[in-house]
């Protein structure tokens, strides 16, 4: 054989090796386990479209940032893991995506559906574009603690996935934080729906959607971010989200038709902002529940909370925003005193209780909130109390100023510290939420200066003379609350179809649509320096009202014949809502 021929043969062998290593389709569990065993950085393992039963994967591999190890479906949504299936990931830079978990049987509830640990923790690992659908144990197992996703390690991500029909004790996504090491996890663009409680709402703990931390390590910081998630028809316990660590952020989430509250149970220095809560008067529903120190709570919209329990009594832990008393010498799993917390520029609409200050879940909770700022909140048509002071705040820095209510009563003195009451005109309404209107007493009424208050709940800029409440009049933001029409479009399983997650996030940042809300004849769309391509506009019923290709990075669209209402604009793989008035 000549040297040239030998070289060609070797080239072919190398090419075949690379193909078999980097891009292989497997159709049996044995082949899958073999492919995982042989995987190296850059390997992509593709699962053949079919139903897989009792798949039990234990992955211990190291990828890199530029060459992760990927396990994916041949066709997203056409690979089904059933029976007693689970995935354990250990190592670094592993991506698991596109799989549906359904039809469970003979589950071992001690083993999570997906755990970011095998023989060691997983760091820089991603679970994306999956669906876990009613993957529950038997009735006899419903009080067993069965977690769907157990986070460990650092810098991990759960995104663009749907978690539907959880029943039984155990978080959907849980980070127990067994150590005090910072996590830097990101949980975003997920859909959490149709959880049902064991017994009545709040009969048992550990029925939340997301829990970050545990009481034992709660005084250490996690730096986890939970954003752009949609919670729908969700009922488990008082904590829809349970924060039990420090320096976490919760923003741009929508809670719709739910029971419970976003609860800062333990930990300090968290931020809760730009979230929408639509409780629909469900019993035992709240907005944000506060314990601990140094939290910032701003730009949240909370509507229709109902503090009644199923038995008709009133819960001390609910309300639009509930600030708890603390317990002297509190143990880590009890109630730390609220200190140095700012509750600023929130909008509370049609709740029974708007703001509840100094509540007592237990009679031993006798420490009043200290150095509490409650400022520039809009409280609209609350039926029981706009502001309830069960225990008055203490500390020289405590102040309540610049709050505005429309009708109803409150436990503060009207016309003191710019706290005012009006009888009408504070807010208007559309099909989605109540918003600030021309002539409102909230316009330019903000008091004080807050470095964190740079935009409003919709993402529009705050002016120097800023408005009271969560929204700035005509600021042009487009971060509207999620609805059912967003599932598989902007949140949840099926969202990430062709682009990488980094590409989608960049497009979301670059895509600009203005003016919002639009009251004129022209809608402007821009995509930085990228070509727009196909632009689609649909109404909330999913009907396509415009589809046009633009070979430019900017476009003007004639909307003068559009009816008033909310529409979805889709450019490439990114969708945003707009309101036309």
State each model region's role:
Residues 1-25, 501, 568:
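Bacterial Sec-dependent N-terminal signal peptides
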Residues 22-60, 64, 458, 545:
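Acidic Gly/Asp/Thr-rich repetitive segments characteristic of extracellular carbohydrate-active
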Residues 32-38, 53-63, 82-87, 243, ...:
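Short, T/G/N/S-enriched strand-turn elements that build extracellular solenoid repeat scaffolds
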Residues 50, 92, 154, 563-566:
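A glycine-anchored, Pro-Gly-centered beta-turn/N-cap motif
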Residues 83-88, 102-124, 132-413:
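Glycine- and acidic/polar-rich repeat regions and solenoidal domains
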Residues 440-503:
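Surface beta-loop-beta hairpin patches that serve as ligand-binding interfaces in beta-rich domains
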Residues 503-581:
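C-terminal outer-membrane/trafficking sorting elements
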């Amino acid at each position: 054989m000549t040297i040239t021929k030998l070289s060609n043969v070797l080239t072919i062998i190398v090419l075949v090796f690379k193909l078999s290593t980097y891009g292989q389709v497997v159709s049996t569990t044995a082949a899958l386990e073999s492919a995982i065993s042989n995987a190296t950085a850059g390997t992509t393992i593709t699962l053949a479209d079919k139903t897989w039963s009792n798949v039990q994967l234990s992955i211990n591999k190291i990828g890199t940032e530029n060459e992760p190890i990927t396990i994916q479906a041949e066709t997203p949504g056409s690979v089904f893991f059933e029976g007693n299936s689970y995935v354990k990931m250990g190592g670094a830079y592993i991506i698991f995506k596109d799989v549906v978990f359904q039809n469970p049987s003979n589950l071992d509830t001690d083993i999570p559906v997906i755990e970011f640990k095998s023989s060691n923790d997983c760091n820089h690992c991603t679970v994306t574009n999956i669906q876990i659908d009613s993957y529950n144990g038997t009735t006899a197992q419903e009080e067993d603690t069965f977690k769907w996703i157990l986070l460990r390690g650092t810098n991990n991500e759960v995104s663009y996935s749907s978690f539907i029909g959880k029943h039984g004790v155990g978080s959907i996504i849980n980070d127990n934080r067994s150590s005090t090491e910072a996590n830097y996890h990101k949980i975003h663009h997920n859909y959490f729906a149709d959880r049902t409680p064991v017994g009545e709402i709040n009969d048992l703990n550990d029925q939340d959607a997301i829990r970050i931390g545990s009481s034992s390590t709660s005084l250490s910081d996690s730096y986890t971010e939970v954003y752009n998630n949609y919670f729908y028809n969700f009922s488990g316990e008082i904590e829809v989200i349970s924060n039990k660590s420090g320096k976490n952020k919760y923003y741009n989430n929508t809670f719709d038709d739910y029971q419970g509250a976003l609860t800062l149970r333990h930990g300090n220095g968290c931020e809760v902002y730009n979230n929408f809560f639509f409780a629909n008067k469900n019993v035992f529903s709240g907005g944000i529940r506060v314990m601990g120190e140094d939290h910032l709570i701003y730009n949240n919209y909370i509507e229709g909370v109902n503090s009644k329990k199923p038995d008709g009594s009133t819960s001390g832990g609910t309300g639009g925003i509930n600030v708890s008393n603390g317990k002297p010498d509190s143990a880590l799993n009890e109630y730390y005193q609220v200190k140095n917390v700012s509750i600023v520029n929130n909008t509370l609409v049609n709740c029974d209780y708007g703001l509840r200050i100094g509540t007592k879940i237990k009679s031993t909770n006798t420490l009043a909130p200290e150095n509490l700022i409650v400022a520039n909140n809009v409280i609209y048509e609350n039926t029981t109390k706009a502001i309830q002071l069960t225990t008055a705040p203490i500390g020289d820095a405590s102040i309540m100023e610049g709050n505005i209510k429309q009708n109803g009563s409150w436990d503060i003195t009207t016309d003191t510290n710019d706290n005012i009451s009006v009888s009408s005109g504070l807010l208007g309404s559309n099909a989605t939420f109540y918003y600030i209107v021309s002539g409102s007493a909230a316009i330019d009424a903000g008091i004080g200066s807050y470095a964190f208050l740079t935009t409003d709940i919709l993402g529009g800029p705050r002016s120097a003379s800023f408005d009271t409440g969560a929204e700035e009049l005509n600021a042009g933001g487009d971060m509207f609350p999620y609805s059912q029409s967003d599932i598989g479009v902007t949140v949840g399983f099926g969202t990430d179809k062709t682009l990488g997650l980094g590409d989608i996030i960049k497009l979301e940042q670059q895509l600009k649509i203005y003016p919002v809300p639009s009251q004129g004849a022209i809608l402007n769309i821009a995509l930085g320096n990228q070509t727009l391509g196909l632009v689609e506009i649909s109404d909330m019923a999913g009907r396509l009202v415009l589809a046009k290709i633009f070979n430019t990075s900017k476009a003007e669209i004639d909307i003068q014949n559009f009816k008033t209402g909310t529409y979805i604009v889709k450019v490439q793989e990114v969708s945003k809502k707009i309101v036309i008035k």
